[in-house]
Amino acid sequence: MYPAHLLVLLAVCVSLLGATAIPPLPLNLVQFSNLIQCVNKGSRASYHYADYGCYCGAGGSGTPVDELDRCCKIHDDCYGEAEKMGCYPKWTLYTYDCSTEEPNCSTKTGCQGFVCACDLEAAKCFARSPYNNKNYNIDTSKRCK
């Protein structure tokens, strides 16, 4: 084997080892991200909502800082209701239609329908709510009491 081939093989192996340390996102969160992009027509990348205010992102506490943060609290509460129904919202996959002017859930019943409705309402709420850069990546220990 040529030395150049060994270097390429080594680089591939090292990169694969690094990739195994990255935990996968729950499948529904990837789908939710795509639904956000569908509703807002790509005007703001989904990751902007992952660390916004007190409720957008993992966890949540205190009083929402603005309308957009209230959207996230409502979404968290909706997922809480789904869990009470025995659903696993972060892992529940559903189908939706993005080809129309008004995106909608193709799945209407059961856990899939409920979780899709949670995500669709949140995505619509995000699209109509102003985004304040000052509320991105805030110190939640000080502002979310």
UniProtKB/Swiss-Prot annotation:
Site features described as Specific activity reduced 20-fold by modification, chain residue numbers: W91
Primary residence: secreted
Cross-referenced SMART domains: PA2c
A GO BP annotation: arachidonate secretion
Function, in words: PLA2 catalyzes the calcium-dependent hydrolysis of the 2-acyl groups in 3-sn-phosphoglycerides.
Family listed: Belongs to the phospholipase A2 family. Group I subfamily. D49 sub-subfamily.
Protein name: Acidic phospholipase A2 1
Species of provenance: Laticauda semifasciata (Black-banded sea krait)
Organismal lineage: Eukaryota, Metazoa, Chordata, Craniata, Vertebrata
